[in-house]
C-alpha cells in the first residue's frame, strides 16, 4: 500500500474520535461535565413542586416547552414560552 493510501486510512480511523470527542457518555459510561451542566442548568431543585420541571432564577415556568433566557435589561434569567 502506498504512503498516501496509508495516511488516508489512518485519517479515516481518527475522524470518529474527533467528531464525538466531547458529547454524551464517556468510555466509562459517565456523562461529560459540559453536557451535564447544560442539562441541569435550568432544572428545578429537588423537592420543588414544579410540574414543568423548568425553573428560571428560582421561578417555576408554566409549561415544559418554555426555556430560560437572560433579560438584557435586568440581567435575570426569565421563562420564555
From Swiss-Prot:
Residues 22-31 form a propeptide. Contains 5 disulfide bonds. Expressed by the venom duct. Its main location: secreted. Keywords: Disulfide bond, Neurotoxin, Secreted, Signal, Toxin. Residues 1-21 form the signal peptide. GO terms for molecular function: toxin activity. One of its GO terms (cellular component) is extracellular region. It comes from the Eukaryota. It is found in: Secreted. Probable neurotoxin. Belongs to the conotoxin N superfamily. The cysteine framework is C-C-CC-CC-C-C-C-C. This is Conotoxin Im016.
Amino acid at each position: 500500500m502506498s504512503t498516501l493510501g496509508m495516511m488516508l486510512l489512518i485519517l479515516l480511523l481518527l475522524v470518529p474520535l474527533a467528531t464525538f470527542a466531547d458529547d454524551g457518555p464517556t468510555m466509562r459510561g459517565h456523562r461529560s461535565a459540559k453536557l451535564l451542566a447544560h442539562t441541569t442548568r435550568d432544572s428545578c431543585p429537588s423537592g420543588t413542586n414544579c410540574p414543568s420541571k423548568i425553573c428560571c432564577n428560582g421561578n417555576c415556568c408554566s409549561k415544559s416547552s418554555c426555556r430560560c433566557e437572560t433579560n438584557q435589561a435586568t440581567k435575570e434569567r426569565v421563562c420564555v414560552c
